[in-house]
UniProtKB/Swiss-Prot annotation:
Its main location: cytoplasm. The keyword Cytoplasm applies. Can self-associate. Component of the AIM2 PANoptosome complex, a multiprotein complex that drives inflammatory cell death (PANoptosis). Component of the death-induced signaling complex (DISC) composed of cell surface receptor FAS/CD95 or TNFRSF1A, adapter protein FADD and the CASP8 protease; recruitment of CASP8 to the complex is required for processing of CASP8 into the p18 and p10 subunits. Interacts (via death domain) with FAS (via death domain). GO terms for molecular function: caspase binding; death effector domain binding; death receptor binding; identical protein binding; signaling adaptor activity. Apoptotic adapter molecule that recruits caspases CASP8 or CASP10 to the activated FAS/CD95 or TNFRSF1A/TNFR-1 receptors. The resulting aggregate called the death-inducing signaling complex (DISC) performs CASP8 proteolytic activation. Active CASP8 initiates the subsequent cascade of caspases mediating apoptosis. Involved in interferon-mediated antiviral immune response, playing a role in the positive regulation of interferon signaling. InterPro entries: DEATH-like_dom_sf, Death_dom, DED_dom, FADD, FADD_vert. This is FAS-associated death domain protein. The gene is FADD. Residues 97-181 form the Death domain. Residues 187-209 are annotated as: Disordered. It is found in: Cytoplasm. GO terms for cellular component: CD95 death-inducing signaling complex; ripoptosome.
């Protein structure tokens, strides 16, 4: 069975009746009133979002936003586990990028706005992130990286993140990423010392305005 569908079933089963009521309220801008009235479970709501292409295994931001609004950290952990599992089956470049993003999430904190500007994310989008997660610093950082990755698409690369980190003097975090990338390269047997030199050049990140 599709791992993402398994996740959605698990999340739905973990929702209380109160959670479902709140979820329907939060989905008013995404799902028609008629479909909301017919929904008897979280899975019913998720099915509509899947059909409308607002939710899938590659685009979990809406699900994360809903679970954050419900303050269901236990269900958010299930989503985190799914995303880590998906990363495990991704191409090496995607796994490296996800690993770098996790390091940023764990270490950047309140400096994320400075990083956002060096990544080319507009002030409008920065404000939107703050409004979306007003009291959740960790989710603000995650959302920044999702916005950046979605806007740069195939140009999203570890070197861009490291260059932006060094550009705003977050050198300790940049060093952590470089060390992790070297370890990952050695582990996979594809280490290439020259591949890391570009990270020190402070190359500009692709625009994400």
């Amino acid at each position: 069975m599709d791992p993402f569908l398994v996740l959605l079933h698990s999340v739905s089963a973990g929702l209380s009746s109160s959670d479902l009521t709140q979820l329907k309220f939060l989905c008013q801008n995404h799902i028609s009133k008629r479909k909301l009235e017919l929904a008897q479970s979280g899975l019913d709501l998720f099915t509509v979002l899947l059909q409308q292409n607002e939710l899938n295994a590659e685009h979990t931001a809406l699900l994360r936003e809903l679970l954050c609004s419900l303050r269901r950290k236990d269900l958010l952990l299930r989503l985190d586990d799914f995303e880590r599992g998906a990363a495990g089956g991704a191409a090496p470049e995607d796994r490296d990028l996800r690993a770098a993003m996790e390091i940023i999430c764990d270490n950047v904190g309140k400096d994320w706005r400075r990083l956002a500007r060096h990544l080319g994310v507009s002030d409008v989008k920065i404000e939107a992130i703050e409004e979306k997660y007003p009291r959740n610093l960790a989710e603000q950082v995650r959302e920044l990286l999702r916005v950046w990755k979605n806007s740069t698409r195939e140009n999203a690369a570890v070197s861009c993140l490291v260059g932006a980190l060094r550009g705003c003097q977050l050198n300790v975090v940049a060093d952590l990423i470089e060390e992790d990338q070297r370890a990952r390269a050695l582990q996979s047997g594809s280490a290439n010392p020259g591949s890391f030199t570009a990270w020190d050049s402070g190359s500009a990140a692709p625009g994400a305005s």
